[in-house]
From Swiss-Prot:
Keyword Repeat (UniProt): no
Gene symbol of the encoding locus: rplS
Cellular component terms per the entry's GO annotation: cytosolic large ribosomal subunit
Family from the record: Belongs to the bacterial ribosomal protein bL19 family.
A biological process term (GO) from this entry: translation
InterPro entries per the UniProt record, alphabetical: Ribosomal_bL19, Ribosomal_bL19_CS, Ribosomal_bL19_sf, Translation_prot_SH3-like_sf
Its biological purpose: This protein is located at the 30S-50S ribosomal subunit interface and may play a role in the structure and function of the aminoacyl-tRNA binding site.
Keywords in alphabetical order: Ribonucleoprotein, Ribosomal protein
Entry keyword Ribosomal protein: yes
Name listed for the protein in its UniProt record: Large ribosomal subunit protein bL19
A GO MF label: structural constituent of ribosome
Amino acid sequence: MGNLIKELQDEQCRTDLVDFCVGDTIRVATNISEGGKERVQVFQGTVMARKGGGAGETVSLHRVAYGEGMEKSFLLNSPKVVSIEVVKRGKVSRARLFYLRGKTGKAAKVKELIGPRAAKK
């Protein structure tokens, strides 16, 4: 029974998504329906957490805009998610970056991972 559920979840998972980790800055493009029209909306932020696995995996992004911190969660395997692009790789030593919530300005930044390790990641 467990194998059947795993096979069904593997069928529903998308394979076109790029690999990213917590601390990376990514750009997520989603389809938005407004008044009978569809458009693509882009949200760029730092990955705070990845939760779940398989078809129900979610990612939480954090961004500071106009002095206010905002968070948005995305279901990775949703058909509304058009694309995910890695802007820069971050160097962190935590699996969850919830300490970014109260920070603004330079304190809310994550160090950038540069060099050959950034390309391998």
